[in-house]
Amino acid sequence: MSSMASVLFAALAISGVQVTPSRGYGCFPQYSQFWGQYSPYFSLEGRSAISSAVPPGCKITFAQSLQRHGARFPTADKSATYSSLIKRIQEDATEFKDEFAFLKDYKYNLGADDLTPFGESQLYDSGINFFQRYHGLTKDSKVFVRSAGSERVVASAHKFVEGFNKAKGSEKGGATKLDLIISEEDRRKNPIAPQGCDAFDNDETADKITDQFRSTFTQPIVDRVNKKLPGANIKIGDIKSLMAMCPFDTVARTPDASKLSPFCHLFSHEEFRHYDYLETLGKFYGHGPGNSFGPAPGIGYVNELIARLTSSPVKDNTTVDHELDDNPKTFPLGLPLYADFSHDNSMTVIFTAMGLFNATKPLSPTKITDPADASGYSASWTVPFGARAYFEKMVCDHSPSAKQEYVRVLLNDRVFPLQDCHTDFLGRCKLDDFINGLTYARSNGNWDQCEVSPPK
């Protein structure tokens, strides 16, 4: 944890505010929880109908986490877009009125692609939280850690292991070697960062839906901004970029993201609700259940989860690399703890293949559907920076049989209501029932329809 973050932590603790790594980012919630996938992870414990605590009389015997990398700078192409937009505004605007005054002398110095220091601290804290929750499984075993090959994902996995080991007391810090890094080269079989489904890649539904929703709220913002920046000639497409600068500038300003970017004050809370929903629509119709091939790339990971839950070989004909998964050194079975690290889009297709969003009805392209009315679906609730999903297996004293095993899924500390198995009042399904419900993945879904000719 950075020195600045440590000072903030101590100050909050002295003031009586509970601060733990599991709470996530709590600053500026009226803004930061409405940044779509660019929201920093915040705990959904308070929005869960079921406590995320281990049920009384139960013991966790297995846990697998799937986590997104921490907060980062914009991707290279978007960083170039944002920089160019700000330069154009500074060259063309004849006045910078009111809250836009800072733009006159603002210097764009955001990097590209890599984690910010705040993003690193997110994953360090995540490692601490993972140890605190599952420390009972660490006595005789280590956590097996895999990462997708992007630098920011690998760096996130390293910070997680660093935090985990620090909490365990086994290391004094420093990057720790990962067990496996899987390349993200084009068409490479990689279940934690899947690709290779042409029909999925060629689907244009998300673009059409997001364009439709953007048209419902953006024009009044354009008119207001152009009054504040006469001569800048701001277009509809520029508004999303200006709004995105709010989260990206905030997570880069300080090591603990404790200073809100002045870009945030350019827009109202209601406008950020629309921004959040715009990003949510992009995920739902681009990588989720709104894309008929949305689940297909996630099949391989679900089949890996089945293998780990049952300590049996992986059965998959989609994105799994069997040279890795048939090798006990690179895909060991029978361990109690696993941690995988990936991207937001990859996690969305995996959750979709698992059927987690089966209760979510198609999202409206014309008006906001609140996450509570979408069975908990939104980009900020499911795949924020540093998102974490836990797949737990447990045994309980009150079970009819001492050998009865249960499965429960937590997504950002919310006990996720499983759809394709019989869920009890604690959010659990019997292991066999859970696996039987994963029929889409076990049958390889519609992967055989992925290979299509590119559109002419």
From Swiss-Prot:
Record EC number: 3.1.3.-, 3.1.3.8
GO MF assignments: 3-phytase activity; acid phosphatase activity
Function in brief: Catalyzes the phosphate monoester hydrolysis of phytic acid (myo-inositol hexakisphosphate), which results in the stepwise formation of myo-inositol pentakis-, tetrakis-, tris-, bis-, and monophosphates, as well as the liberation of inorganic phosphate. Myo-inositol 2-monophosphate is the end product.
Superkingdom classification of source: Eukaryota
Cellular compartments annotated: Secreted
Assembly, per entry: Monomer.
Natural source organism: Arthroderma benhamiae (strain ATCC MYA-4681 / CBS 112371) (Trichophyton mentagrophytes)
Swiss-Prot/TrEMBL catalytic activity: 1D-myo-inositol hexakisphosphate + H2O = 1D-myo-inositol 1,2,4,5,6-pentakisphosphate + phosphate; 1D-myo-inositol 1,2,4,5,6-pentakisphosphate + H2O = 1D-myo-inositol 1,2,5,6-tetrakisphosphate + phosphate; 1D-myo-inositol 1,2,5,6-tetrakisphosphate + H2O = 1D-myo-inositol 1,2,6-trisphosphate + phosphate; 1D-myo-inositol 1,2,6-trisphosphate + H2O = 1D-myo-inositol 1,2-bisphosphate + phosphate
Signal peptide from the UniProt entry: 1-24
S-S bridge residues: C58-C396, C197-C450, C246-C264, C421-C429
Glycosylation sites: N317, N358
Family matches, as PROSITE patterns: HIS_ACID_PHOSPHAT_1 (PS00616), HIS_ACID_PHOSPHAT_2 (PS00778)
Lineage, opening ranks: Eukaryota, Fungi, Dikarya, Ascomycota, Pezizomycotina
Keyword terms of this UniProt record: Allergen, Disulfide bond, Glycoprotein, Hydrolase, Secreted, Signal
InterPro entries: Acid_Pase_AS, His_Pase_clade-2, His_PPase_superfam, Histidine_acid_Pase_euk
Main enzyme class: hydrolase
Active site (record annotation): H69
Biotechnology: Phytic acid is the major storage form of phosphorus in plant seeds and, thus, in seed-based animal feed. Phytases are therefore of considerable economic interest.
UniProt protein name: Phytase A
GO cellular component, one term: extracellular region
Residues that bind 1D-myo-inositol hexakisphosphate: Q37, Y38, R68, H69, R72, T75, R152, K283, H343, D344
